[in-house]
Amino acid sequence: MAIKSMMHIRSAFLLFVLLLTACLGTPQPSDSGIEGTVAVGPMCPVMQANVPCPDQPYQATLTVLTTSGKKVLQFQTDEKGRFRVNLASGDYILHPESPNVMPSAADMPFTVAEHKFTMLEISYDSGIR
């Protein structure tokens, strides 16, 4: 009787491990994805000739969607607006999140090729005019 009980426990444990492994999902490849920078501008209320007013790096939250709108992942850039994220090859949409009405940025479709990183530059509009 004890041997039969041990076999049931072992079977239940193996089933648990298999189900847990299945729930973890497919790991993202490490040799393809997206990388780039995020900036916000304009930063000066009135642009003047010979007075530089470059866009500034912007720490943003970005969401990657499938072309049908399903969320793949969400991540945050570093304080200098830089990011590098692993993704499987395919077609996606990058949705820049906005904490308020401004700054805002448009969705950006992109493609990831096998074994390559796609470079993206995202520009948020500050709303300053």
Residue ranges: model-predicted function:
Residues 24-27:
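Bacterial signal peptide processing site
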Residues 67-80:
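Short, acidic Ser/Thr/Gly-rich low-complexity loop/linker segments typical of extracellular
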Residues 20-22:
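C-terminal motif of bacterial Sec signal peptides marking the signal peptidase cleavage site
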